[in-house]
Amino acid sequence: MATLPQKDPGYIVIDVNAGTPDKPDPRLPSMKQGFNRRWIGTNIDFVYVVYTPQGACTALDRAMEKCSPGTVRIVSGGHCYEDFVFDECVKAIINVTGLVESGYDDDRGYFVSSGDTNWGSFKTLFRDHGRVLPGGSCYSVGLGGHIVGGGDGILARLHGLPVDWLSGVEVVVKPVLTEDSVLKYVHKDSEGDDGDLFWAHTGGGGGNFGIITKYYFKDLPMSPRGVIASNLHFSWDGFTRDALQDLLTKYFKLARCDWKNTVGKFQIFHQAAEEFVMYLYTSYSNDAEREVAQDRHYHLEADIEQIYKTCEPTKALGGHAGWAPFPVRPRKRHTSKTSYIHDETMDYPFYALTETINGSGPNQRGKYKSAYMIKDFPDLQIDVIWKYLTEVPDGLTSAEMKDALLQVDMFGGEIHNVAWDATAVAQRKYIIKLQYQTYWQEEDKDAVNLKWIRDFYEEMYEPYGGVPDPNTQVESGKGVFEGCYFNYPDVDLNNWKNGKYGALELYFLGNLNRLIKAKKLWDPNEIFTNKQSIPTKSLKEYKQTK
């Protein structure tokens, strides 16, 4: 088993082929597979585990002495939905999970390291400074997903995206193959090529331009004091298509309101699960805001119950964690003047709420798709949702559909107050983000599960060319959608038009060309590449080479 050498270069290297059958390295199965059990790096020869930023430089140089561009991948949390890290092409992995330093720099501000997870950084920022990143909730997802991937979460309506607060990054780049890698610090005020490199990290995705080692924030929002949380379960028994439309209409109306501290997660599980669930969260910072939040939830719940009476919580539902269900019957804390909050409604200190909702779900085989929505669902889409969440496809049983769902996340608010080109995240009009999900256990069920989610998605967007194209004019109007979310990658989008350029257009809209410019400057040899990585050629240049 590999150990740190006497002269520590800031990394260790694990030679996959050095073990023997009777004494295999116990780390290798974990080092060669991501969270999605569909993806395994079957041809990996070396794993470099880095512990210092300079070690990341050296590890990249050593890897490139043995491997060709495009066969070295970076891993942190390992939650990538597609095989962008673990596929048959990868020969070397640079694992940055040893980079976990965090703190405060007098010149650069708060910083967290790229090897840390959402939960690790939350504990540090909250414990030491009372600050938070307004990112997602899945505890084991690496910071690349929550920051450079354009992540968002329950505080995004109130504070915007994490990239809106990003002020600097420390990143290893290797623009010249024959020269040593360089550790650079670039920031919001950087100009020229350095400015393009910083901007590319404000949502341009991890593993595209170099190896990120640290993220810096000149300032961060203060943590809320607490959160009022409603956990509303609905039975499929007796539920109708029209009731679903009414419920979604109310949900969209709430998303358009001015209550930036209120956010929702609506997980519509397949009928086979027998129930589905809506979570509503309102954060507060003082007693006055707390009473307003409690009163708001009382009226929201009463309004929703006019459509359908909530049922008792029964069990934690499966799936890749968004904001995971609460435990059954947590202890209530009624300390306000009112006492009419439902049993499913809780008053949590912010730290406790974050602990409650930060699950990542079980490691399964999975497939995902996404869409940003500016307007309500057209009637035709309600019909499609009802069809695919109530019918059991050929080749699957009802029991095997229990972990299939459409997740409807509420956003807007401060996200809207940033220009589309201020960061690489161009989507600044959306109020809802959809995540289509399905999960299963066995490889022999891959094809039928993939067919179900692909058919669902294509039928949802059939009038728009099979994808949520922002530019397609139909009877319901233009601008219903704002493309797709890069952090929920979907290789099927490469089949839409112009290969991966079409997919990247849906992810980055008008920001794609500037990302291509940064790629050409800082990774011209495409060391870092995958099925949907940023290319070095524009679409016009690409077509000229075909």
Swiss-Prot record:
Role of this protein: Catalyzes the selective oxidation of C1 hydroxyl moieties on mono- and disaccharides with concomitant reduction of molecular oxygen to hydrogen peroxide. This results in the formation of the corresponding lactones, which typically undergo spontaneous hydrolysis. Hexose oxidase is able to oxidize a variety of substrates including D-glucose, D-galactose, maltose, cellobiose, and lactose.
Cross-link (6-(S-cysteinyl)-8alpha-(pros-histidyl)-FAD (His-Cys)): H79-C138
Residues that carry a glycan: N95, N358
InterPro entries: BBE, FAD-bd_PCMH, FAD-bd_PCMH-like_sf, FAD-bd_PCMH_sub2, FAD-linked_Oxidoreductase, Oxid_FAD_bind_N
Gene: HOX
Cofactor note text: Binds 1 FAD per subunit in a bicovalent manner.
TM spans (from-to): none
Catalytic reaction(s) noted: beta-D-glucose + O2 = D-glucono-1,5-lactone + H2O2; D-galactose + O2 = D-galactono-1,5-lactone + H2O2; D-maltose + O2 = D-maltobiono-1,5-lactone + H2O2; D-cellobiose + O2 = D-cellobiono-1,5-lactone + H2O2
UniProt name for this protein: Hexose oxidase
Known partners and oligomeric status: Homodimer.
Family: Belongs to the oxygen-dependent FAD-linked oxidoreductase family.
PTM entry text: Cleaved into 40 kDa and 29 kDa cleavage products, but the 2 polypeptide chains do not separate and seem to be physically linked together. The FAD cofactor is bound via a bicovalent 6-S-cysteinyl, 8alpha-N1-histidyl FAD linkage.
Keyword list, A-Z: FAD, Flavoprotein, Glycoprotein, Oxidoreductase
